[in-house]
A protein has these predicted regions:
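Binding/recognition "hotspot" determinant
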Residues: 2-341
Length: 341
C-alpha cells in the first residue's frame, strides 16, 4: 500500500498476508483502533397502598382493619468503551513514512519487521473502560387496628448500592517480530505502554533514533456493593382476651415495652486490582542520539511476556446485590422471630 502524496490511515482494520505487507507514505501513517461504546441509563420506581379487613382467631378473636403502603425507587448506569485494534499479520512487514508513523491501538506481527520513519514513531496502547452504578431503596409501613386488641404498627427500610469501574489495556500496541527481529529507524521514538519486541536474539534486533521517550500505563479495577436493612414494630392500646381457664382479662400494652427493631448488619462485597502495561523494548543493538546503549541503561522493560498484565474483570454487580438481599431478608426474619420468642 503506497501513498505518493498523502497519508495512510487504517482504522479498525485487519490485514493478513502470507508473504509481505508494505506501507509506504509520502507523509504520515496512522494505524488506530476502532471503538465500541455502550451507554445505558435507567430509573425505576414503584408505590402501592392497600386497606383491608380481616378476622383474627385465637386469644384475641375479632375483626381488624389494616392499612399498608410501600415505596421503592432505583437507578442504574453503565458506560463502556472497548477498543478493536488494527492488526497487520504477515511473514514480513515493512513500514516507511516521510513523516510520523503512529500505532494507536494497533499491532504489527511478523517474523521480520522493518520500519523507517522520517519523523516520530509513536506507539500508544489504548485502555478499555467500564463504569457501572446500581442503586435501589425501599420503605414500607403497616398499621392494624381493632376493638379489643392492641394496635399494631410495623415498618421496614432497605437500601442497596453497587459501584464498579475499570480501565485496562486488553491488547498492547506495538511491533511484534519473530526470529527475523525488528529493524527500526526513526527521528524520535515515543512509547506509551507500547512495545518494540521480538523473539530473536539481540544480534537480530536494531533500533536507531535521535531520541527516545517512554511511559507505562496503569490499569485498575474496583467494585463495592453494600446492602443495609432495618425493620421494626410496636403495639399499643388495650388488649382483652381469655386466659387458659377461660377467665376474661384486660392488659394495657405500652408501646415503649413492645417496640422492637430488627436491624441487620450491613453486607459488603469489596475488591480491587491493579496492574501495569509496560513500555517495552526487547534487547537489541540500540543507538539513541548517536550513542550505543542497552535496555538496562535506558531503564525500560524488556520482557514481552510480562509487558501487559491484566486486571480482574468486574463481577456481576446486580447478582451480588440480589444475593445480599436474600441474606438480609433471611437474617431479618430470624432476628424478628428470635425477639418474638
Amino acid at each position: 500500500l503506497t501513498s505518493t502524496e498523502g497519508d495512510i490511515h487504517l482504522k479498525n482494520t485487519q490485514v493478513n498476508a502470507k508473504d509481505k505487507i508494505s506501507l509506504d507514505a509520502a507523509k504520515d501513517i496512522l494505524l488506530e483502533s476502532g471503538q465500541s461504546k455502550e451507554y445505558a441509563d435507567g430509573k425505576n420506581s414503584n408505590a402501592g397502598a392497600q386497606v383491608g379487613v380481616g378476622v383474627s382467631v385465637g386469644a384475641q378473636t375479632g375483626v381488624y382493619v389494616y392499612a399498608e403502603a410501600g415505596y421503592g425507587k432505583g437507578s442504574n448506569h453503565l458506560e463502556s468503551t472497548t477498543h478493536n485494534n488494527t492488526t497487520l499479520n504477515a511473514d514480513k512487514i515493512s513500514i516507511k513514512s516521510q513523516g510520523d508513523t503512529t500505532l494507536k491501538g494497533a499491532q504489527a506481527k511478523a517474523n521480520r519487521i522493518d520500519a523507517d520513519v522520517g519523523g516520530n514513531l509513536n506507539i500508544i496502547s489504548q485502555q478499555d473502560t467500564l463504569d457501572q452504578n446500581n442503586k435501589q431503596m425501599g420503605v414500607g409501613a403497616r398499621v392494624q387496628v381493632s376493638a379489643g386488641t392492641a394496635w399494631d404498627a410495623s415498618g421496614n427500610f432497605n437500601n442497596s448500592s453497587a459501584k464498579g469501574n475499570s480501565k485496562s489495556v486488553n491488547e498492547q500496541s506495538g511491533l511484534f517480530a519473530g526470529e527475523g527481529g525488528y529493524h527500526v529507524k526513526a527521528d524520535h521514538v515515543d512509547l506509551k505502554g507500547g512495545a518494540i519486541a521480538s523473539t530473536a536474539s539481540k544480534e537480530n534486533n536494531n533500533l536507531t533514533a535521535n531520541s527516545l521517550t517512554f511511559s507505562n500505563i496503569e490499569n485498575e479495577s474496583s467494585h463495592k456493593a453494600t446492602t443495609v436493612a432495618l425493620s421494626g414494630g410496636t403495639r399499643f392500646g388495650e388488649e382483652k382476651g381469655k386466659d387458659s381457664t377461660g377467665a376474661q382479662y384486660t392488659n394495657n400494652v405500652n408501646w415503649r415495652d413492645s417496640t422492637t427493631f430488627s436491624p441487620t448488619l450491613p453486607q459488603q462485597d469489596k475488591d480491587s486490582d491493579s496492574s501495569t502495561t509496560y513500555a517495552t523494548i526487547s534487547e537489541g543493538n540500540i543507538s539513541i542520539g548517536g550513542k550505543d546503549t542497552t535496555v538496562e541503561n535506558l531503564g525500560i522493560h524488556s520482557d514481552i511476556n510480562t509487558a501487559n498484565q491484566k486486571v480482574d474483570a468486574l463481577p456481576d454487580l446486580q447478582a451480588i446485590l440480589d444475593k445480599q438481599k436474600i441474606v438480609s431478608d433471611a437474617t431479618s426474619t430470624v432476628v424478628a422471630a428470635t425477639r418474638t420468642y
